[in-house]
């Protein structure tokens, strides 16, 4: 039995080194990944499986032809298509996990404005899994299902194997207003101090300037006495990720047109 927060991680499905076992691990990890995130694209699958794009294209075509995946064309992301689950895939997952599953994502329910953002979140987690840094994760959709409420949700929550702690993942795709940033800081403080949902917040983006902007504005807000925010608390609990490799990866796969 695979823990629900580990579903989608390919290594959790590999029962032997046989060709069939490796194929099944790819298939079921992908189905669980899509179930948890709602949809995905070829660029995310490349990272998740750690294979070449040609392999991904060949495999997803087979899954589409087999009636497992629904391929949806879109101009809202660089890959120009995303993949959803078909009823057959849900039945396969229900049989695998021995439980009833509900999946209500349809092409009409996907917000085009958030597709790239959501794919980048998946990219960050897949990259962390590939690097051996993430043990398990909780998606934003799952936080919503767990009745944590809109004001407490982040893009994802992960278990950081290196630091042995829960961390929140936040992806910045644009500059935010000062009131919005102030609200976010208060939400982070509550989630960390009162609710014990995670210990740190990690800020990622496809461009260094958005990470820098978040750091600059947050520093200004936390240092202002009238906001009643502990500057040292946020310096300890918010980390701004300037990893050049990851920023370039995100930009080239999800943003560059």
Task: Tell me the role of every PLM-derived stretch.
Residues 105-121:
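A short, highly charged nucleic-acid-interacting micro-segment common to nuclease
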Residues 175-186:
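Active-site-adjacent loop/helix micro-motif of nuclease/hydrolase catalytic cores
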Residues 72, 112-115, 125-167, 175-177:
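Active-site metal-binding core of divalent-cation-utilizing nuclease and nuclease-like domains
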Residues 1-103, 107-108:
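Nuclease-adjacent, charged terminal/linker segments that flank catalytic cores
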Residues 186-195:
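Short, basic/hydrophobic alpha-helical segments
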Residues 2-3, 11-17, 21-33, 39-42, ...:
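Non-catalytic C-terminal interaction segments of nucleic acid-processing enzymes
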Residues 141-142, 171-173, 204-208:
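Structural motif
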């Amino acid at each position: 039995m695979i823990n629900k927060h580990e579903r989608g991680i390919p290594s959790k499905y590999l029962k032997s080194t046989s060709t069939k076992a490796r194929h099944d691990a790819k298939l079921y990890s992908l189905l669980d990944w899509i179930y948890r995130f709602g949809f995905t694209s070829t660029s995310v699958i490349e990272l998740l499986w750690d294979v070449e794009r040609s392999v991904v294209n060949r495999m997803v075509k087979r899954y589409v032809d087999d009636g497992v995946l629904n391929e949806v064309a879109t101009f809202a992301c660089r890959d120009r298509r995303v993949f959803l689950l078909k009823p057959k895939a849900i039945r396969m997952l229900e049989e695998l996990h021995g439980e009833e599953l509900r999946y209500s994502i349809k092409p009409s329910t996907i917000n085009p404005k958030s597709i790239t953002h959501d794919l980048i979140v998946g990219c960050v987690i897949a990259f962390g899994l590939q690097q051996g840094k993430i043990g398990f994760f909780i998606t934003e959709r799952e936080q919503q299902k767990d009745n944590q409420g809109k004001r407490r949700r982040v893009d994802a929550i992960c278990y950081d194997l290196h630091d042995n702690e829960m961390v929140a993942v936040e992806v910045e795709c644009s500059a935010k207003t000062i009131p919005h940033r102030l609200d976010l800081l208060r939400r982070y403080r509550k989630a960390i101090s009162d609710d014990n949902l995670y210990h740190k917040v990690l800020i990622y983006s496809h461009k260094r300037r958005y990470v820098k902007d978040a750091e600059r504005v947050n520093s200004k807000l936390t240092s202002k006495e009238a906001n009643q925010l502990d500057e040292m608390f946020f310096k300890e609990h918010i980390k701004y990720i300037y990893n050049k490799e990851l920023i370039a990866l995100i930009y080239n796969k999800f943003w560059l047109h």
